[in-house]
Structure formats: C-alpha cells, structure tokens
Amino acid sequence: MGSLGISEIYDKNSFNEMEFEFDPSAPPPFRLAEIRNVIPKHCWVKDPLRSLSYVVRDVIFVATLIGIAIHLDSWLFYPLYWAIQGTMFWAIFVLGHDCGHGSFSDSQLLNNVVGHILHSAILVPYHGWRISHKTHHQNHGNVETDESWVPMPEKLYNKVGYSTKFLRYKIPFPLLAYPMYLMKRSPGKSGSHFNPYSDLFQPHERKYVVTSTLCWTVMAALLLYLCTAFGSLQMFKIYGAPYLIFVMWLDFVTYLHHHGYEKKLPWYRGKEWSYLRGGLTTVDRDYGLFNNIHHDIGTHVIHHLFPQIPHYHLREATKAAKPVLGKYYREPKKSGPIPFHLVKDLTRSMKQDHYVSDSGEIVFYQTDPHIFRSAPKDE
C-alpha cells in the first residue's frame, strides 16, 4: 500500500470532522513544529545580495520619480506622482521592516544600518518601532498584551470620548493614525516610540531607541532645512503628500491583516492564548499588482508565525504549510490589478468591530450601533 502524502493526511483525517462547522477558536490539531517541518529548508535562507537588490531597485525608483516630478512641476502630474511615490515609500518601509525582523540578512550590523537608512528616510524611528513590532508578533491575538490595532475592552471603550471613537472608526481618520501611534501608542496604552524610558522598552533597549530617535531627528531637521531652501509647498508636493499616502497604505494593510475577514475571528486572553493560536487569527490578503511592489507583505500568516523567513520565500512557505493549516488558513480573495474589494472589507470592519467583552478568555468583536449618533454634551 502506498503511503499517504502529508496533504492527504491532514485534509482527510485532521479536518474531516470540521468540514461543515469550523470553529476558528478551537485549539488546532497541529503544533508549530509541524508547520515548520513542512517548509522547505531553502525558504529559511537569507540572501543579503538579493535583499540589497530590492533596496537598490526601490531607491532608484523613488529617486527617478522625484527627478521627474521636479522636472515636470505640473499639478496635472502631481496626483499621480503622490499615489506612486507614496506606494514606493510603503515598499521602502517593508524592506526596513524586514531588517527589523532579521529576515533581511544574518548580519545584525547590516540589518540595523540598512533599516536605519530606510526607516529614517520616511520618518520612522527604526529601533523604537522594531521593538514594539516585535512585541506585536510575540503577543499577536492577545487582547491584553498585543501592541497594534488591539481591540478595546468594553469598559475602556465606554470610557474613551466621542472624538477618540470618531478618529478610531470613521474613515479616513484611521488611515492617518500611524504618526500619532508613534507618538502616543493606542487608546489604553501609554508611552512613545521616541522616548527611551517609555513603557515599550526594557532598560537594555534604551540606547537603541536613543540612536533611532537621533536619526529621526536628523531627517526631520533635513526636511525643515529643505523647506526653507525650496519652500514648504514644494516640499509638500515632493515629500509631504507621498508621506501621507505611505501612512494610509501602512494603516490600511496592517489593519486588514488582523481585521475585516468575512467571519469574525477570535481574540484571546489568559490560558486560552498561545503563540500558535494567536498567529492563526491573522489574515492573508491579495493586493493585486501591488503584491510584488510591496514585497509580498500580504502573505501574513506564515510571516507572523515565522518572521525570520525572507519575504521572497513567503509564498512558497505558505504553499507548503497550507496542507497542515487546513481550515485555519483562510485563502485570500483574488484581487484584480487594484484591490478595491479590500476597501469594502475595511469599511465593514470599521462599522462592526468596535470592542470586545471585558471577561472571557476567547472573545470576538462586538458592535456599538449608536457609535456616531451624537457627541456627548461635555465634549
């Protein structure tokens, strides 16, 4: 009798009983090691030259766009420039994000140097964000300890003011949240990505935060100097507007990787949470023609479970892992060239996903039907 392939084993046995009614909050019938073992060994290999080639490609593209915009200096061209350049700023961010994870190369020095250059150029404090993002990965799906786009417990939700809810749930304001998050974090959390004494950081991490804050300050000072040299309007056209598009991309993508799926997904507390169960609540997305431009950031599930895998191996790693993941992997909707369908997912989530219960170790988003009816009189 021939042996069954791994996909047959998992598809026919492990998930047969869940074929008609699948509970995404149920403990998975596999371990993290089982997923790791089916991912080809070469997917874990980091090629610094290949990683640097993406940096060179993106930087050349950004510089070329700046040159074209300055040469044409046309209001007819600027909206197109802003859209494309803001998209490229986001691509630059993703490469710096890979440096922070250590998936860029095996050299910590190379990762940190490249990461600082890329992130400082788009006003991101490299180490400050790297450390908080590491916290996010280590606590994904945990209501109490996750770091970004965390659901508010009902008591906190009822406590925050109307203006906070308006900015948090009323499009387009959530798509402009990132700079404020860097400064003040999310509702219910304190600290800053620029302050080495923030609650975000351990004492041994303070020197790294200082370095990144200094690099950010140098870039901010350079931008101010360029404003005096070339005018604030010119700098807004060349840098400011693309920066806003980049921020919108970042908030759009990071939100949809943890929200907006067609069926509500669980969040955890206490003993019900585990690294594996939290990671399985993340969602892959198809961004159409932007998949390659954004370095396959949409392959998010495997990235969250194994952030050390380089982005150029994530598609292959995901394909290899899917037979093990079974229904715990949610196949993303196929996109046309432009992922317009994701705007619908975002809008639906903003209207429905407002808070979670204060109690219970497995919770789901609940809806406040009166969220925008009227502002309180004391506001």
UniProtKB/Swiss-Prot annotation:
<feature type="short sequence motif" description="Histidine box-3">
    <location>
        <begin position="300"/>
        <end position="304"/>
    </location>
</feature>
<protein>
    <recommendedName>
        <fullName>Omega-3 fatty acid desaturase, endoplasmic reticulum</fullName>
        <ecNumber>1.14.19.-</ecNumber>
    </recommendedName>
</protein>
<keyword id="KW-1133">Transmembrane helix</keyword>
<keyword id="KW-0443">Lipid metabolism</keyword>
<feature type="short sequence motif" description="Histidine box-2">
    <location>
        <begin position="133"/>
        <end position="137"/>
    </location>
</feature>
<dbReference type="InterPro" id="IPR012171">
    <property type="entry name" value="Fatty_acid_desaturase"/>
</dbReference>
<dbReference type="Pfam" id="PF11960">
    <property type="entry name" value="DUF3474"/>
</dbReference>
<feature type="transmembrane region" description="Helical">
    <location>
        <begin position="236"/>
        <end position="256"/>
    </location>
</feature>
<feature type="short sequence motif" description="Histidine box-1">
    <location>
        <begin position="97"/>
        <end position="101"/>
    </location>
</feature>
<dbReference type="GO" id="GO:0005789">
    <property type="term" value="C:endoplasmic reticulum membrane"/>
</dbReference>
<keyword id="KW-0472">Membrane</keyword>
<comment type="function">
    <text>ER (microsomal) omega-3 fatty acid desaturase introduces the third double bond in the biosynthesis of 18:3 fatty acids, important constituents of plant membranes. It is thought to use cytochrome b5 as an electron donor and to act on fatty acids esterified to phosphatidylcholine and, possibly, other phospholipids.</text>
</comment>
<dbReference type="GO" id="GO:0006636">
    <property type="term" value="P:unsaturated fatty acid biosynthetic process"/>
</dbReference>
<dbReference type="GO" id="GO:0042389">
    <property type="term" value="F:omega-3 fatty acid desaturase activity"/>
</dbReference>
<dbReference type="Pfam" id="PF00487">
    <property type="entry name" value="FA_desaturase"/>
</dbReference>
<comment type="similarity">
    <text>Belongs to the fatty acid desaturase type 1 family.</text>
</comment>
<comment type="pathway">
    <text>Lipid metabolism; polyunsaturated fatty acid biosynthesis.</text>
</comment>
<keyword id="KW-0812">Transmembrane</keyword>
<keyword id="KW-0256">Endoplasmic reticulum</keyword>
<keyword id="KW-0444">Lipid biosynthesis</keyword>
<feature type="transmembrane region" description="Helical">
    <location>
        <begin position="52"/>
        <end position="72"/>
    </location>
</feature>
<keyword id="KW-0276">Fatty acid metabolism</keyword>
<feature type="transmembrane region" description="Helical">
    <location>
        <begin position="213"/>
        <end position="233"/>
    </location>
</feature>
<keyword id="KW-0275">Fatty acid biosynthesis</keyword>
<dbReference type="InterPro" id="IPR005804">
    <property type="entry name" value="FA_desaturase_dom"/>
</dbReference>
<dbReference type="InterPro" id="IPR021863">
    <property type="entry name" value="FAS_N"/>
</dbReference>
<dbReference type="GO" id="GO:0016717">
    <property type="term" value="F:oxidoreductase activity, acting on paired donors, with oxidation of a pair of donors resulting in the reduction of molecular oxygen to two molecules of water"/>
</dbReference>
<keyword id="KW-0560">Oxidoreductase</keyword>
